[in-house]
Amino acid sequence: MPQQSMQASLRDPIAEIERSNCKIAHLRLGLVFTSDNNERALQDSGLYSPDSEDSSVDIAGRRFHSGTLNGSSIVYVKTGSHSVNMATTLQILLARFSIHGVIYFGNAGSLDKKTMVPGDVSVPQAVAFTGVCNWKKFRSEKGKLVFGDFNYPENGENLLGTVEYEKIKMFSPSEAPKEVFWLPITKSWYNAATEALKDMKLRKCYSDECLPGEPKVVFGSKSSTSDFYVRNKAYGDFLNDNFDAKTADTTSASVALTSLSNEKLFVVFQGVSNVAGETSSNSRVSYLASYNAFLAATKFINSIPTPRLACE
């Protein structure tokens, strides 16, 4: 019988495994990101090699690529921005491919420039959906976000009232559904990342653009995810003061929730591309943030044991 092509195998990811008579729980690492900038960082690095000329497959409008990243077997996919696209694409990845764990890299905004500035990479310890809320009636006494506190030039009443932040329901195959706010990064992978990246040197310049200082990797922070990108300083300060969130993006919590619901290992690498309330970084600095996040993700991937076939 003629052997199936790689693309056919990817359409039915267990086909090759069944032919080999290997019983295997996991085969590859899943690498996910949102933007063209992120994908360009991967391609520009020269570290990715496709398995063959026919090693990609389109599912539900997303293209999944099978190959190696500096020798480690991966499937990567560009998900598109915002939480619904990330969650949908990641669920397809986990349902259709044999994935050992999920690595996300992408861009985020800093909510505390004393902690992180453009070019730095954050490896958060926990992420949360801060866009899930109950908008209260005017003069409600409940709600953490009080719009009247932000009236200018003086505080006072505001018809927008207050907003109460809510937990989300997390489903899991082995536990009853439960409500959670903070979603913890897989502890073993977070610890592995802190060890692998503790002395990492990031890229400072791209083209003729250089960062004013040496970029660094920051560990152990918390991150906020919502479907709006936070550029407003007052709201960024609110998230920092009330939730101790140091970065904000539109996707990390979706990676966390989907991975946890499927009981998969996962880790997040955020390249800081701007500071809330300050002038937006130019495209070269934004790309540099993507590239540094990619470098951190790659070094982590190459530091963990490679998933093996059970019959090897």
UniProtKB/Swiss-Prot annotation:
UniProt-recorded name of the protein: Bark storage protein B
Signal peptide range: 1-24
Keyword Signal: yes
Annotated glycan sites: N70
Inducing or repressing factors: By photoperiod. Short days stimulate accumulation, while long days inhibit.
Function: May play a role in nitrogen storage.
Species name: Populus deltoides (Eastern poplar)
Xref: PANTHER family: NUCLEOSIDE PHOSPHORYLASE DOMAIN-CONTAINING PROTEIN, PURINE NUCLEOSIDE PHOSPHORYLASE
Keyword check for Signal: yes
GO molecular function, one term: catalytic activity
